[in-house]
């Protein structure tokens, strides 16, 4: 997902190229079909679809909701990575996503012992929430 309104942006962001809203391809039916084909071709190897960027929650919510609805039809866990708190995530995201990683990257809080749901998080302020368990 391209585009991040971070103000300020995270120091040492893992993907500063994604801050620009004008890069990448627009999500549409053709793009979804490409994703669907890849997931079907590698079905036995793919357990989840992870969405990060940029900032997922700085996007057009109508387009984001449509994308999540499409992806949900692929019967894979949907992960969203956001700098925002869970309380700031839109309702449709809570309903359609299986996991939501919250918390911006804060270099001063870097750590190597924040393992949650099989994902090593970069800083101690980050948390992963699982649908049905944590929200």
Task: Provide a role label for each language-model segment.
Residues 1-29:
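Canonical Radical SAM [4Fe-4S] cluster-binding loop centered on the CxxxCxxC motif
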Residues 18, 54, 104-105:
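Flexible loop residues that form catalytic
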Residues 20-36, 57-94:
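Canonical radical SAM enzyme core domain
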Residues 45-70, 116-118, 132:
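Conserved glycine-rich "GG(E/T)P / GGGxP" loop and the immediately following alpha-helix
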Residues 49, 78-80, 102:
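Hydrophobic faces of well-ordered beta-strands that scaffold small-molecule active sites
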Residues 88-135:
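Classical nucleotidyltransferase
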């Amino acid at each position: 997902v391209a585009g991040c309104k971070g103000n300020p942006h995270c120091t040492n962001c893992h993907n500063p190229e994604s801050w620009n809203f004008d890069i990448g391809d627009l999500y549409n039916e053709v793009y979804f079909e490409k994703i669907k084909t890849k997931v079907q071709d590698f079905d036995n190897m793919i357990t989840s679809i992870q969405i990060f960027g940029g900032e997922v929650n700085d996007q057009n919510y109508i387009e984001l909701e449509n994308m999540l609805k499409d992806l949900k039809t692929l019967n894979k866990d949907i992960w969203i990575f956001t700098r925002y708190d869970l309380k700031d995530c839109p309702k449709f995201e809570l309903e359609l996503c299986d996991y939501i990683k919250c918390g911006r990257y804060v270099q001063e809080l870097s750590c190597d012992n924040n393992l949650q749901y099989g994902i090593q998080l970069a800083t101690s302020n980050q948390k992963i929430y699982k649908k049905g368990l944590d929200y």
